[in-house]
Amino acid sequence: MISSDAIRGYHDLMLLSLLASGDSYGYALAKAIEQRSGGRYTIRESTLYAVCTRLETQGCIAAYQGRETHGRPRIYYTLTKYGRDLLRARRAEWQELKSVVDAFALPPPKRKKKRSDNS
C-alpha cells in the first residue's frame, strides 16, 4: 500500500488526468484511482473533495449538477482549458522528478573494471 504522505503532491495530477478522459463525479473518481493504481492506493473521500474544491477555486476544473441519485443531484467535474494546460505541465514535471528520484532509488549501474596496463 502506498502511504498518503508519499502520494500527497500528486493528487492534482491524478484527478486532472482522469478528468482529461471525460467528466466524472467524486465516487467514480475515487474508484478510478483505486482501480488504476491496482488497488495500491485508495484516496479518502475528504481528501478527494478537498482537492476538487481547490482545483475548482484555481479554475482548473468546473463543477456542475448532474442527474439526481438517491434524491440528491450528483456533482460532476469537468476539466477547463487551464486545467488541461496544468495537466501538461504536471506530466512534464513528473517525468523530470521521476528521473531525479530514480537516480537515488534505483541501484547504480555496475561499473566495468578497468584492466591495468602492465605490458
What are these regions (language model features)?
Residues 79-83:
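Accessory beta->alpha helical hairpin/"wing" motif in late/C-terminal subdomains of nucleic-acid enzymes
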Residues 2-47:
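N-terminal helix-turn-helix DNA-binding core of bacterial DNA-binding proteins
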Residues 49-53:
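Short, hydrophobic-biased segments on the C-terminal half of alpha helices
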Residues 56-73, 78:
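Beta-hairpin "wing" of winged helix-turn-helix
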Residues 18, 54-55:
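Conserved catalytic core of Hanks-type protein kinase domains
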